Each structure stands twice: as structure tokens, then as C-alpha cells.
Amino acid sequence: STEVATAKHVYECLKAGIDILWVGARTTANPFAVQEIADALKGVDIPVLVKNPVNPDLELWIGALERIHNAGLKRLGAIHRGFSSYDKKIYRNLPQWHIPIELRRRLPNLPIFCDPSHIGGKRELVAPLCQQAMDLNFDGLIVESHCNPDCAWSDASQQVTPDVLDYILNLLVIRTETQTTESLSQLRKQIDECDDRSEE
């Protein structure tokens, strides 16, 4: 898989036999660039993943997915990689989990993957972010891995070795029980009853 940002990228990837394409966050933020990619993909059957735009704009993200879908591509997915912020105290990109959760509500059949490497920006944050994504029912993870992360040409601080990635994946707890609206309503009712008793 590889990232495409222009029609030329698409043509070169298809010529090289790349099997999955993704649209990066900066490209997703530009509807003209997304349309150029969508036009280049017309008549092609290839999986395309669309990262969230750098700014927290759900409509822009959905718009990019729709442009590619309208070009005839059916195998689409979304990648949540967090959102740019001046405040980089903890994360490189703020997760703002409510945005991909709303994307899931609006497009329930769309696979959504999490990119904990770009959210965290530091390799020590990758494992807890992987677990958090799984707890939020993401469909999968896209984790940056390198045999010698410190020598990686880009994003070295957020990459983990293949052995560390294997360790992280083996420690993940995958929850099988999902909450329904009805079960959440029942829990809210029980909480309200407890609150009412404590006020007496």
C-alpha cells in the first residue's frame, strides 16, 4: 500500500501493481486534489483508504469519501490519524475520538482504522492508543514499523520495531460485547435511580 496525492501518483501505483492506496490527511483537506484522485481511479477496482483531514472537519472527511465512492470505487475505508493542534503536550495529533465515532454512526458499514503512530507521535504511546482504538470498536490498526526506527527516513520517533509491534498486538484485548442503545438506556436508568436515592 502507498499514499497518493495526485493523479500521477495513482497512475504510477497502478502501473507498479500496488494493491491498496490511501489518501493522506493533507490531501483529504483539499477537495480539488481528492477529485483529481477520484477521476484517476474511475473504472479501477482497488481498495482506497482515506485519512481524516488535518483539521477536525467531519463533513470534509465524508466529502472525500463520497468523491471517491462516486467515482465507482466500492472498497473504501477510513483512517483516523488525529487532528493537528498547537497544543502538543501529549499527542502529536489530538485524537478527538468523537469525530470517528460520529463517522461510524453516519456510515455504519465503512471500515474505520486507527493510526496510533500519527496520533501519538511517540513510540511509547502506540500501545495504549492501539488498545483505546480497539476499545472503541475500530476495525483495525495502521501502525508504523521499522527494523531500526531511529534510522527511519520519516517519523522515526513514532515507529516501533516489528518485534515490539508483535508484542503490542499480542497484548491487545479485543472486546466482543458491544453495547446497544437499549442496554445503555438501561444503565442510564440505573444511574438515575442511584442519583435519586443519594439526593434523599
Can you name each region flagged by the protein language model?
Residues 29-167, 171-173, 179-180:
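Catalytic alpha/beta core domains of metabolic enzymes, predominantly
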Residues 200:
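Conserved small/polar residues in nucleotide/adenosyl-binding loops
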